């Protein structure tokens, strides 16, 4: 038998969020090994901003991040998005892993977004939490100036709510699930709602992507297999999460995993281009960013399209991508 080549070493950055868990699952279940990779996960970062800073500093080869990559590209980082860790290739809106939580005496009413007016709301600037909150305000007919936004890292949001430093927060899981268990009288004002399209990409710097196509395909096959395992085994997946996300308790992980598996889809379709375009459009309209970039220059779908063709079984439990949004290599998105 031919000797197996030494596995290819990879360092991948993740954020302490339940929707990132395909990475540790692929490590623990041996999927990376199966495809010839030796993957080290760089510590869970608080947000994608921190993960991208680590990528820029050369601490990692690739990261999983979303909205913060928009700001990074506009500041001159040449990033390429080549897969989705969370989002949806079959429909436009997907934000099931996000929620807005209010404190019990805040005067904010469950289901009534207009009651946010005049309140202090915690979010993490430049992340999907921020984009989601902006989307909620827009849905309520409010503007960002109708509330006081407080820039807060996710690990500190529940403390801020308990101490009444803020009236509410918008965040990704597990933070909202923890609030509902640990903050007396906490109110889930809204969860998800298809208010925005989730942005969660596998990202690396362009020179690295140009040199490592075969490695990227191996990586995407391994995490796609981890995704499918997670969709089929949410309870076991939640248990793995407790070993990787600091302070994550099993009951919280299991609840969060039920939301997470609703949008675990590594595939790329025209919807994912639109999601990135729409996020920029919203952020620019509301003055968060000054300029925008062409999404076609920063999404490279050929690697995941190759994996979809070679390993169709890894996606067989997902809804098929509608023909009108299915793409081929060389696809150009036009808004």
Model-derived regions, located:
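Conserved C-terminal helix/tail region of periplasmic/extracytoplasmic solute-binding proteins
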Residues: 284-335
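Solvent-exposed, polar/charged alpha-helical surfaces in well-ordered, non-transmembrane soluble domains
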Residues: 21, 29-30, 49, 53, ...
């Amino acid at each position: 038998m031919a000797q197996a080549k030494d596995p290819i070493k990879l360092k991948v950055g993740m954020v302490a969020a339940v929707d990132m868990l395909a990475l540790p699952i692929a490590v623990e279940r041996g999927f990376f090994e199966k495809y010839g990779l030796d993957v080290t996960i760089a510590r869970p970062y608080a947000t994608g901003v921190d993960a991208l800073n680590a990528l820029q500093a050369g601490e990692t080869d690739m990261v999983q991040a979303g909205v913060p990559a928009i700001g990074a590209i506009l500041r001159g980082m040449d990033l390429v998005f080549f897969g989705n860790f969370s989002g949806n290739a079959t429909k436009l809106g997907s934000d099931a892993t996000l929620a807005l939580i209010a404190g019990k005496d805040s005067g904010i009413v469950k289901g009534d977004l207009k009651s946010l007016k005049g309140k202090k709301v915690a979010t993490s600037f430049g992340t999907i939490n921020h984009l989601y909150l902006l989307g909620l305000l827009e849905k309520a007919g409010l503007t960002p100036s109708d509330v006081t936004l407080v820039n807060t890292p996710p690990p500190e949001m529940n403390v801020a709510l308990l101490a009444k430093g803020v009236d509410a927060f918008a965040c990704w899981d597990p933070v909202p699930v923890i609030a509902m268990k640990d903050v007396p009288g906490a109110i889930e004002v809204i969860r998800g709602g298809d208010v925005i399209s989730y942005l969660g990409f596998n990202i690396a710097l362009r020179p690295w992507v140009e040199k490592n196509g075969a490695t990227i395909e191996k990586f995407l096959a391994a995490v796609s297999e981890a995704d499918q395992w997670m969709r089929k085994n949410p309870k076991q997946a939640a248990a793995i999460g407790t070993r990787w996300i600091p302070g994550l308790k099993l009951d919280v992980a299991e609840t969060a995993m039920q939301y997470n598996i609703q949008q675990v889809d590594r595939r790329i379709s025209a919807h994912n281009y639109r999601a990135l375009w729409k996020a920029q459009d919203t952020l620019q309209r509301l003055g968060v960013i000054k300029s925008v970039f062409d999404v076609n220059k920063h999404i490279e779908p050929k690697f995941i399209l190759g994996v979809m063709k070679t390993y169709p079984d890894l996606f067989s439990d997902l809804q098929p991508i509608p023909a009108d949004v299915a793409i081929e290599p060389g696809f150009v998105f036009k808004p």
